[in-house]
A protein has these predicted regions:
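Helical scaffold of the NTase/Pol beta-like nucleotidyltransferase catalytic core
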Residues: 1-97, 222-227
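A generic signature of intrinsically disordered, low-complexity regions enriched in glycine/proline
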Residues: 12, 119-121, 154, 166
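Active-site nucleotide-donor binding segment shared across nucleotidyl transfer reactions
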Residues: 84-116, 120-127
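Generic structural signal for short, solvent-exposed loop/turn connectors between secondary structure elements
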Residues: 108-111, 157-160, 225-227
Length: 227
């Protein structure tokens, strides 16, 4: 596996190549917003973006482990990552809530998340970028042209931690998502290992899982709904 960084015409690029056959599929998923050029994935940032040096250092040090976790070749210590998230944001105005598989896992579902997905406001997205400045693998991105959200952030703290800030109303059309404004208006609070965590309602997560044809996940949610 090889990584390189360069700056051209005011843009600094991060690139990774030579991931190998066993990591090719997870690379396609994790690096889906990178540009693909043959066997290399690359992403550019304005060269004057604050924090690029630490992002590059973190990216190069954790990229292989991150891909191996995504391929399930290495365990994903999501509990450790979530505890660190809770510790770092405790008492601070971060305003995040859980989405995806981790939102089910903290309810007690028999599921092992591959990462931790968060949803928050735009201000909170920037705040998380400050709180995790030492662990960012990409700078927090502000992109109003995205159909999903205005902000994106990614860090690696023993496992991948991703967040979106200010999700767009369009993510709830034609059907509500489990990470958009509809879910945000219906959040529930659960207790997990001493922490109070906000999660979307199970019926929304079930509907999303059914649309994605995640039959095993639907069965897990049904079991929780029938308790």
């Amino acid at each position: 596996m090889a990584m390189r960084r360069w700056t051209d015409a005011g843009t600094t690029w991060f690139a990774i190549s030579g991931v190998g056959r066993e990591l090719a599929a997870p690379a396609e998923r994790l690096l889906m917003d990178y540009q693909r050029d043959g066997g290399e994935w690359r992403r550019g940032y304005p060269a004057d973006t604050p924090g690029l040096d630490i992002c590059w250092q973190n990216f190069t040090s954790c990229a292989e482990l991150m891909l191996r976790q995504a391929a399930r070749l290495q365990p994903v210590p999501w509990r450790e990552t979530l505890h660190e998230l809770c510790r770092r944001t405790s008492g601070r105005e971060s305003g995040w809530w859980l989405a995806g598989s981790t939102a089910l896992a903290v309810r007690g579902a028999s599921i092992e998340p591959g990462d931790i997905d968060l949803v928050c406001s735009g201000d909170a997205a920037r705040s998380l970028g400050t709180i995790f400045a030492d662990a960012l693998i990409e700078p927090v991105v502000y992109d109003t042209s995205s159909p999903i959200s205005d902000y994106w952030g990614r860090a690696f703290v023993t496992a991948r931690l991703e967040w979106i800030g200010a999700p767009k109303a369009g993510v709830d059309s034609p059907s509500p998502s489990d990470f958009g404004p509809v879910a945000a208006s219906r959040l529930e609070t659960v207790t997990w290992e001493g922490w109070q965590l906000r999660v979307p309602p199970l019926d929304l997560q079930r509907a999303v899982s059914q649309r994605r044809e995640l039959t095993t996940r639907v069965a897990l949610i049904d079991a929780m709904l029938n308790q």
